[in-house]
Amino acid sequence: MKKLYMIVDVQNDFVDGALGFEKAEDVVKQIVATLETKLEPEDVVVFTRDTHFENYLETQEGIRLPIPHCIHGTYGWEIVEALSPWIKTTTPIFDKPTFGSLELGNYLKTQNFDEIEIMGLVSNICVITNLPRLRKPHFRKLGLL
């Protein structure tokens, strides 16, 4: 059974940066524990990155949330170091300039996963907005951490 582990926006700015929050490090620890204990050789791990640019404050999101974060190429934009063991040169990483990722949706159309486990930060925005991209009739199970 082929399983996808989707890690959504686990970036420095959401842990200890501009939009960091107290429990973020606990979420990172749970994700690490899940990958260490559940990941099988046939499974796939993908990452998404919230991605903005220097003009962020001029964008629709920046006007509504005027806190620069996850600016492309900065420390805050990088995926947290704790997850680096699961990032290989072939690991799919989807940069998202908006809440969801069309590129991720297109990737999923080409794959045959039996299960998807989605984990990440800012669940009420970043994680949830990626769920519509996951609808495929053949998915047996969709887990949310």
Where are these regions (language model features)?
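Short, well-ordered secondary-structure micro-motifs
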Residues: 18, 57-59, 104-106, 129-130
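General structural signal for secondary-structure boundaries
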Residues: 103, 138-141
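Short acidic/polar active-site loop segments enriched in Thr and Asp
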Residues: 43, 114, 140
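Short, glycine/serine-rich, charged loops/turns that create anion-binding
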Residues: 11-12, 52, 98, 123-125, ...
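Active-site acidic carboxylates
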Residues: 1-93, 143
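Histidine-anchored nucleotide/phosphate-binding helix
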Residues: 32-37, 128-139
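Internal catalytic-core helix/loop-beta-alpha segment
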Residues: 73-127
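A short glycine-rich beta-strand->turn/loop micro-motif centered on a GG-aromatic cluster
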Residues: 117-121, 140-145
